[in-house]
Amino acid sequence: MSRTYAELPRLMTLMTGDEKHEPSATSTLDVLWVLYDRVLRTSPDRLDDPGRDRFLLSKGHGPAAYYAVLAAKGFIPESWLSGFGSADSRLGYHPDRNLVPGVEISSGSLGHGLPIGVGVAHGLIAQGLPVVGDRAPRVFVLVGDAELDEGSNSEAIVYAGAVGLSNLLVIAVDNQSSSYGWGAGGIEAHFAVSGWSAARVSGRDRAALASALSASGSGPRLVVAAVEAKSVEGKS
């Protein structure tokens, strides 16, 4: 049974493990909901469908919101949430693709999701999967702004732009936790110089997120989802 956005806080509170990385989880909640509710062409009955969209959570150290959304959309039972982080639970502090239905990659070590996403996007093109509806399957990668400090992302960004991976979309949740900042033009300029189209929206405006995440173009796309700074997350 698919649940509503209003039920996510209750689902989140069911996870009582010691290390939920709450700021990392709450910063991604709206993006994750919009993806699974309005954008991604995937569902619990399409886990092995070659034509499904792929979602890669590179920001894997804050999976509580991810698990809540997967439960809300029927990928995992709600009853799993209360065991979060326990020794015999499928729901670890980092998502495991071998244990959690719907999880495409095991993540948590930062800087891996975007390079993997480039490879997956390339692989889908190489397979020549047919267009269903108005587009072929796409790859969506969720990263954090601080994670982009990792050098492994730079090569992936340049390569994706150079070969024009139009089936790749990266969402960067910006809570101003990057070590060095981004200077003039922000994260968007860092991607745009390599041939990406880029947009910035509020990471709490679900309508704006849906519009930005549904857009497509002739090359890879970046959507920066700006949220409250990490130092003040959870405060009014």
What are these regions (language model features)?
Residues 3-19, 172-173:
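N-terminal capping segment at the start of a domain
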Residues 19, 24-162:
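Cofactor-binding active-site loop characterized by glycine-rich and histidine/acidic residues
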Residues 30, 61-62, 175-176, 205, ...:
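Glycine-rich beta-alpha junction loops
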Residues 138, 166-169, 197:
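Residues at the starts of beta-strands that form the adenosine-phosphate
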Residues 148-149, 177-179, 230-233:
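Flexible loop/turn segments at secondary-structure boundaries
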Residues 179-189:
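Short, glycine/polar-rich helix-capping loops at beta-to-alpha or helix-loop-helix junctions
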